[in-house]
Amino acid sequence: MASNERDAISWYQKKIGAYDQQIWEKSIEQTQIKGLKNKPKKMGHIKPDLIDVDLIRGSTFAKAKPEIPWTSLTRKGLVRVVFFPLFSNWWIQVTSLRIFVWLLLLYFMQVIAIVLYLMMPIVNISEVLGPLCLMLLMGTVHCQIVSTQITRPSGNNGNRRRRKLRKTVNGDGSRENGNNSSDKVRGIETLESVPIIGGFWETIFGNRIKRVKLISNKGTETDNDPSCVHPIIKRRQCRPEIRMWQTREKAKFSDGEKCRREAFRRLGNGVSDDLSSEEDGEARTQMILLRRSVEGASSDNGCEVKNRKSILSRHLNSQVKKTTTRWCHIVRDSDSLAESEFESAAFSQGSRSGVSGGSRSLNMSRRDSESTRHDSETEDMLWDDLLHGPECRSSVTSDSEGAHVNTLHSGTKRDPKEDVFQQNHLFWLQNSSPSSDRVSAIIWEGNECKKMDMSVLEISGIIMSRVNAYQQGVGYQMLGNVVTIGLAFFPFLHRLFREKSLDQLKSISAEEILTLFCGAPPVTPIIVLSIINFFERLCLTWMFFFMMCVAERTYKQRFLFAKLFSHITSARKARKYEIPHFRLKKVENIKIWLSLRSYLKRRGPQRSVDVVVSSVFLLTLSIAFICCAQVLQGHKTFLNDAYNWEFLIWETALLLFLLRLASLGSETNKKYSNVSILLTEQINLYLKMEKKPNKKEQLTLVNNVLKLSTKLLKELDTPFRLYGLTMNPLIYNITRVVILSAVSGVISDLLGFNIRLWKIKS
């Protein structure tokens, strides 16, 4: 329905726009429709020694982002919590079987509590609504966190979605042949069905390893036919117990095409030496990738680092120079550039061990190793595989291994423009990656000072190992546990100290304690309801503060990254913390320093933690607004109600966590934006000019680059934001005025004079 409305809007827009056009505009549109296919083109290449502003901003090291808006994610989160058992498959995929069983128990207990309250509405309603609100809030937050992994649930509907494999690039302008594609399809079809109850992550981990082995054992044969083969992955009918997916490929070749394909197979096996030269293959490769980069690199989306197999095989291509197959790129004749964007090439070359005198390239689908990287260690291993090559062993966790199968099961239809952008992103990382540049750094082994050439990833690996070895405090975990226990027992304690004096507490009986615990005469339904409410409050409150502790730990790690990064150019502190040390005495060193800065800023959880912090921030504002409204309604009777006391406890605990996060975030920004480092390096350059006048011109150049870097960092750096929301300025101002107006009313009522906080400039 929505697509039909958009089509109707586009049609009417073009219709009324036709009345405004003049001859010059119509001629320009005709030129644009023809496209650039008839324009003369020259060979070109991208210079990897230059940097983009994305490197300084940090978007070069992109992170995963959801493909649907947050409003839809919120709606889906609420639906998945309200109808929790109906989405059991989804919850098992994004959590685990044990956690799902635990959450299912809490869900049924909450349903029983609501039913008992409707039957006997004697207990305070806040004791029932509190856990319910927490359940809805955390379910929505979790749905937004995992939205980068699965964007559509794999329900049992009748609409079976399809997903096309990316077109692979092979020899002289030809497609991958049918035999090899069929072998890959048969390899993929051997994926076994898995029962849900049999260890979800373990099963997916094993199946994915099996699938990768089956595909990687197949070589690549090429043919000369320019016709395109479209391998398609179909989703079978999914059942709650068993999920199977199957790949089918339809291809038609003539007899002449089969002969040419057989000839190229002999070439790949080393039978014939009539291979194209390496220079020809590299020239074609540069033309292909340049064309793709021009077409696709138009957005700044956060995309995941995918298809490590394809990048690994390209690294092998630099080592195996005698037996490389020629690459190709097929672009169908079309009337616009938009049609050619649907052809995304998965470029890969590699060699197979054990073949003397020749090697065969491995061409795989670009989605072969798609992962979501829920933890920072998995992402680091993918970086090593991506930038160093297959010799780096990647220890991918079960979460990232399961992400590929989950994505295939979801049947998500991806935008071809996004696929092209992801290819260009990987191509840039491969050709101008930080791992290709090295700096002469100083390391300490005991009391000895030694030099070695290190890349950005090697330096960052040492920094991350120091951060991981840091002993984290448990103060905020203890605070969360204390607040959890206090909120769980609060209704009982409130009734106890309100109805009993200190003298009466000494002689209180067990029956009276049970009555105060239930808040009503202790009949069986009331006792069951009170026990359920206590258990729900205890578990859900602990889960909420557990998420807060995760956010606090992440902010602490970000601060440690920034702290160690600021010590790299200091010899004394670098030796103290056992990290590499180098000076910004060369332009190349400045480039590596900026790359390391951007890389460390993007390490670890980003958007997922921002979702948690944003939710806590909005919850704190909501509670503050409710408390202000209650105080304005009657400040003398404000503390008579138990839920107002609960609001105050929640507000105090959340403010403590938010103050901690705000202090860590601001300190992290200060460490990364510390201009004194660059100023100190400029002073060092002047000192070197005085000692070595013959290098004055070179040192002056470096000094000018340092000045430009200082200005650029000041231009791009933004102040720390506690909430991860991109808020409209109008909505922000309205929210600020409403909240501050309520607080101003409370303060004016308590102090006796008018004060208007919203007029104070923030």
From Swiss-Prot:
Residues 365-376 have a biased composition (Basic and acidic residues). Residues 152-184, 344-380, 393-415 are annotated as: Disordered. It is found in: Endoplasmic reticulum membrane; Golgi apparatus, cis-Golgi network membrane. Its main location: endoplasmic reticulum. It is a multi-pass membrane protein. The modification Phosphoserine is found at residues 272, 276-277, 334, 336. Glycans are attached at residues 179-180, 363, 431, 674, 733. GO terms for cellular component: endoplasmic reticulum membrane; Golgi apparatus. Residues 348-361 have a biased composition (Low complexity). Widely expressed with highest levels in testis. Residues 6-150 form the PHTF domain. It comes from the Eukaryota. The chain crosses the membrane at residues 77-97, 99-119, 121-141, 473-493, 512-532, 611-631, 645-665, 737-757. InterPro entries: PHTF1/2, PHTF1/2_N. Keywords: Endoplasmic reticulum, Glycoprotein, Golgi apparatus, Membrane, Phosphoprotein, Transmembrane, Transmembrane helix. PANTHER family: PROTEIN PHTF1 (PTHR12680:SF8), PUTATIVE HOMEODOMAIN TRANSCRIPTION FACTOR PHTF (PTHR12680). Interacts with FEM1B. This is Protein PHTF1. It comes from Homo sapiens.
